Amino acid sequence: MASSSSAAALWTAAPHPHGSCIRIHAIFHQRHQRRGRRPVVVASSVRPLQAASLAVATAPVAVASRRTAAEEAVYEVVLRQAALVEEATHRRGAGAPRWAEEDAVDWGLLLGDAYHRCGEVCAEYAKTFYLGTQLMTPERRKAVWAIYVWCRRTDELVDGPNSSYITPKALDRWEKRLEDLFEGRPYDMYDAALSDTVSKFPVDIQPFKDMIEGMRLDLWKSRYRSFDELYLYCYYVAGTVGLMTVPVMGIAPDSKASTESVYNAALALGIANQLTNILRDVGEDSRRGRIYLPLDELAEAGLTEEDIFRGKVTDKWRKFMKGQILRARLFFDEAEKGVAHLDSASRWPVLASLWLYRQILDAIEANDYNNFTKRAYVNKAKKLLSLPVAYARAAVAS
Ligand SMILES: CC(C)=CCC/C(C)=C/CC/C(C)=C/CC/C(C)=C/[C@@H]1[C@@H](COP(=O)(O)OP(=O)(O)O)[C@]1(C)CC/C=C(\C)CC/C=C(\C)CCC=C(C)C
Ligand SMILES: [Mn+2]
């Protein structure tokens, strides 16, 4: 949502080599209310609770039913990515190139520069992610940087300095470029790095296409009628990141968890992060005419769009926010269970980023739910403390 002034650099600094990114649904399971029932099983057939606010406000809701259309659509992608990873692991080896060596472009030294620049961009825009990649193997680290840069550039299309010029056609062109790079025909050096990454790791193109789809939504959609609609949006712009990065970060060889369950946890982390982003930015978004909150849940809480634009913290608002925060925390909890199944070097950065983001929810509470005019943030001391604590926890999990 926010844009960055140095973003233009992502578009201009790159020399052109040719000369010129279920249902976890967290099973959104009211475990605090359904004591004595089976623990959460990721990807079961139980329907996620679409309105966690209900969990706060009302009696237990029976949630066992079929997946919604949004959940089905997302679940398909999870299954597809999990299958790709399993196939790569069992048949070809996770490090084998996707297409025949002779078809691949020989980027030679350029590729080294391309990855290096991706690292610089990641370091500049996302210091914590960057720091987190330092323990990974060089191959994995470079690959996460390349994915990061592609995601950042995609977001900058609709949120950056040139966003007013972005049309659905421009996003179609960006998607064509994505297809090209997946087929070994990168357009610029950042694309070349990602092209190399997807040739080495079993990364499916669908989450990348879906992130572009999320950006398409941002071009015309500024209201979400239900959590189901919002869930799909969060999957598009953030859940996808989990599906893109786990094939690179790797699942622990001794993990007994199913590939699919680890992917569901990764998806949960993206959703949790985006729900947190949304709750933090309610005021900022409303000033841009946007409301990324489920309108039906707002109405159930006795709140209207006008209440959001007015931006007054009332008891109704506090109650509504408590429900939204609870839901985001459930997604974080779901994600946290998956961390232990990642390759050991990847656990620390993921846990650290999870804790840092989750603390934003604590900050919203500390601000007495005033997310209209106060920006919730995690102070530097807390940030710094999270890193060694996450490191110690991740080490214990190995
Ligand atoms: C098993 C398990 C738990 C695995 C973990 C899997 C994993 C690493 C998941 C990553 C989840 C994650 C970091 C999601 C990103 C969510 C996010 C911040 C999305 C942002 C979307 C739109 O935001 P908006 O415009 O509303 O807000 P801004 O004001 O613009 O911030 C994004 C901006 C989309 C673009 C996403 C990125 C640029 C971040 C991509 C990050 C990576 C590829 C690095 C992940 C690596 C590590 C080490 C955690
Ligand atoms: Mn953005």
UniProtKB/Swiss-Prot annotation:
Induction: Induced by salt stress and abscisic acid (ABA) in roots. One of its GO terms (molecular function) is squalene synthase [NAD(P)H] activity. Expressed in leaves and endosperm. Expressed in developing leaves. SUPFAM superfamilies: Terpenoid synthases. GO terms for biological process: carotenoid biosynthetic process. The keyword GTP-binding does not apply. Its EC number is 2.5.1.32. The keyword Transferase applies. PROSITE patterns: SQUALEN_PHYTOEN_SYN_2. Residues 1-80 form a transit peptide. InterPro entries: Isoprenoid_synthase_dom_sf, Squ/phyt_synthse, Squalene/phytoene_synthase_CS, Trans_IPPS_bact-type, Trans_IPPS_HH. One of its GO terms (cellular component) is chloroplast membrane. It is found in: Plastid, Chloroplast membrane; Plastid, Chloroplast, Plastoglobule. Pfam families: SQS_PSY. Keywords: Carotenoid biosynthesis, Chloroplast, Isoprene biosynthesis, Membrane, Plastid, Transferase, Transit peptide. It is an enzyme of class 2 (transferase). Signal peptide: none annotated. It catalyses: 2 (2E,6E,10E)-geranylgeranyl diphosphate = 15-cis-phytoene + 2 diphosphate. It comes from the Eukaryota. Its main location: plastid. It is a peripheral membrane protein. Belongs to the phytoene/squalene synthase family. Catalyzes the conversion of geranylgeranyl diphosphate to phytoene. Mediates the first committed step in carotenoid biosynthesis. PANTHER family: BIFUNCTIONAL LYCOPENE CYCLASE/PHYTOENE SYNTHASE. This is Phytoene synthase 2, chloroplastic.
